[in-house]
């Protein structure tokens, strides 16, 4: 009886917190298996759902636990239901009901879908910067054109947009092999249109794209500034698919409202469904990405080396991948297996500008010059006092330590009285943002830089 009350309370809280579609996907599909010794065992049909439960719903489990059991209940997630008797035939029938696909049309050979098999949800690393985009992508892969249509995902280069597009397509084909799926960069779509137009084969072009169950368009910003006829054809393709309740997923390097050179009617349609952004990965996510990328390379990347690398590249995943490639090249040449910070530093030296300066500037020199400028002692800088002038000096010094040295975030934090790496990240982001808004602060920091160098 208590278990039922406990679970119903969790669902009530979840319904208040999540959107309807997110609630249907994450909460309704979950199942409470048992509560035993203050541990709630919760079945999730997909491992990717765990992060949303951890990030968004864990606290409501605790609240519900105190309400019903007068105890702190800890969740434990499982992904295989105990003694699951559901037959594969029943599962398949359920899937066929959920997906709005075209069973009468001939399926597309995988080689013609444009998808890359290596990109799946299983190997996509989730973090705070992409959790909602991943959640939306998963929802789309469960309910084609019933949840978000179109789904528009935007963010900078190297953040995983292409990976997510492919993951959606691969997931659909895993569940329904006959679904008609096409992944294509916008530039390739444009070229395909122009080729068919030149050859007088527009009917063939229309049949190819307008008979799809799922159209995945990457880098839709490439359509900006193109001729009216090109935008007109994409507009008609979009309408044809949307009217037939076929799923469309688009990615871009900017949000729909910032897409210049596109007809307003297209921009409006891009906003019909759901728009989600992906931001650069945080420190913990970068470490998880590095662990995933390095675990099968045959080298021993020490934990402090991974932390060092995660502290060096914070803009996108491609920089991390490039650094790993450089490191493994050096390791191969030197015939070594253990990757230390020294090896990593040697590898990324060429990837950093002004490294000769970065390597010789000690953090205490930065602290001294910043302290002299703002009238703050190094002891105060390393302390925890929150006076405005001390906080500013501390954050500026952390910012410059990040900009002018190749020290890892944990190392910088340690030099400021054992501060956590997240404090360094916050300080760097704060000062970087203020510099863009405050010319006086920008000039002050430039002046300090000259004294340091």
Curated annotation (Swiss-Prot):
InterPro entries the UniProt entry points to: AAA+_ATPase, Chromosome_initiator_DnaA, Chromosome_initiator_DnaA-like, Chromosome_initiator_DnaA_CS, DnaA_C, DnaA_dom, P-loop_NTPase, Trp_repressor/repl_initiator
Enumerate the CDD domains for this protein. AAA, Bac_DnaA_C
- Coiled-coil intervals in this record? none
Sorted alphabetically, which keywords does the UniProt record give? ATP-binding, Cytoplasm, DNA replication, DNA-binding, Lipid-binding, Nucleotide-binding
Give the start-end ranges of region Domain III, AAA+ region.
114-331
Gene Ontology molecular function, alphabetical: ATP binding; ATP hydrolysis activity; DNA replication origin binding; lipid binding
The protein's matches in Gene3D superfamilies, at most eight in alphabetical order, are given as: 1.10.1750.10, 1.10.8.60, P-loop containing nucleotide triphosphate hydrolases
Instruction: Write the signal peptide boundaries.
Output: none
> What subcellular compartments does it reside in?
Cytoplasm
Listed under GO biological process in this entry are: DNA replication initiation; regulation of DNA replication
- The principal localisation class reads cytoplasm
According to the UniProt record, where is the region Domain I, interacts with DnaA modulators? 1-74
> GO CC annotation: what is one?
plasma membrane
Q: Which SUPFAM superfamilies match?
A: P-loop containing nucleoside triphosphate hydrolases, TrpR-like
- Domain of life according to the entry: Bacteria
Q: Where is this region: Domain IV, binds dsDNA?
A: 332-453
- List the residue ranges of the region (Domain II): 74-113
| Positions with a binding annotation for ATP | 158, 160-162
The record describes the protein's role as: Plays an essential role in the initiation and regulation of chromosomal replication. ATP-DnaA binds to the origin of replication (oriC) to initiate formation of the DNA replication initiation complex once per cell cycle. Binds the DnaA box (a 9 base pair repeat at the origin) and separates the double-stranded (ds)DNA. Forms a right-handed helical filament on oriC DNA; dsDNA binds to the exterior of the filament while single-stranded (ss)DNA is stabiized in the filament's interior.
- Stated family: Belongs to the DnaA family.
Notes concerning its domains: Domain I is involved in oligomerization and binding regulators, domain II is flexibile and of varying length in different bacteria, domain III forms the AAA+ region, while domain IV binds dsDNA.
Subunit-structure text: Oligomerizes as a right-handed, spiral filament on DNA at oriC.
Protein name as it appears in the record? Chromosomal replication initiator protein DnaA
What species was this sequence derived from? Streptococcus pneumoniae serotype 4 (strain ATCC BAA-334 / TIGR4)
């Amino acid at each position: 009886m208590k278990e039922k009350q406990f679970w119903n309370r969790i669902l009530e809280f979840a319904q208040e917190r999540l959107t309807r579609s997110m609630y249907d996907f994450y909460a309704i599909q979950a199942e409470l298996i048992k509560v035993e010794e203050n541990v709630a065992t919760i079945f999730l049909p997909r491992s990717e759902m765990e992060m949303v439960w951890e990030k968004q719903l864990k606290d409501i489990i605790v609240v519900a636990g105190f309400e019903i059991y007068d105890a702190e209940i800890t969740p434990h997630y499982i992904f295989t239901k105990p003694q699951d008797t559901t037959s594969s035939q029943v599962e398949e029938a359920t899937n066929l009901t959920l997906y709005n696909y075209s069973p009468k049309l001939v399926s597309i050979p995988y080689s013609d879908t444009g998808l890359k098999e290596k990109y799946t949800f299983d190997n996509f690393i989730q973090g705070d910067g992409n959790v909602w985009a991943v959640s939306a992508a998963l929802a789309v892969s469960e309910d084609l054109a019933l949840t978000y249509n179109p789904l528009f995902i935007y963010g900078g280069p190297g953040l995983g947009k292409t990976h997510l597009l492919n993951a959606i397509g691969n997931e659909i084909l895993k569940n329904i092999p006959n679904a008609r799926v096409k992944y294509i960069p916008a530039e390739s779509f444009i070229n395909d249109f122009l080729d068919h137009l030149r050859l007088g084969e527009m009917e063939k072009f229309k049949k190819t794209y307008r008979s799809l169950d799922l159209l995945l368009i990457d880098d839709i910003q490439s359509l900006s500034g193109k001729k009216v006829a090109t935008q007109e054809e994409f507009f008609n393709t979009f309408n044809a698919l949307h009217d037939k309740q076929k799923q469309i997923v688009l990615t871009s390097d900017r949000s729909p409202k910032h897409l210049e050179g596109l007809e307003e009617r297209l921009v409006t349609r891009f906003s019909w469904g759901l728009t989600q952004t992906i931001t650069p990965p945080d420190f913990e996510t970068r470490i998880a990405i590095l662990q995933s990328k390095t675990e099968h390379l045959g080298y021993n990347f020490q934990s402090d080396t991974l932390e060092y690398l995660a502290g060096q590249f914070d803009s996108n995943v491609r920089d991390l991948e490039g650094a790993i490639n450089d490191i493994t090249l050096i390791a191969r040449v030197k015939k070594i297996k253990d990757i230390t910070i020294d090896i990593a530093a040697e590898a990324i030296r060429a990837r950093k500008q002004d490294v000769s300066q970065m390597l010789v500037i000690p953090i205490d020199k930065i602290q001294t010059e910043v302290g002299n400028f703002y009238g703050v002692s190094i002891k105060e800088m390393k302390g925890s006092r929150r006076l405005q002038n001390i906080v500013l000096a501390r954050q500026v010094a952390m910012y410059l330590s990040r900009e002018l040295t190749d020290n890892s975030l944990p190392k910088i934090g340690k030099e400021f009285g054992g501060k956590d790496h997240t404090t360094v990240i916050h300080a760097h982001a704060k000062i970087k943002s203020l510099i863009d808004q405050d010319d006086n602060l920008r000039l002050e920091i430039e002046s300090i830089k000259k004294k340091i160098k």
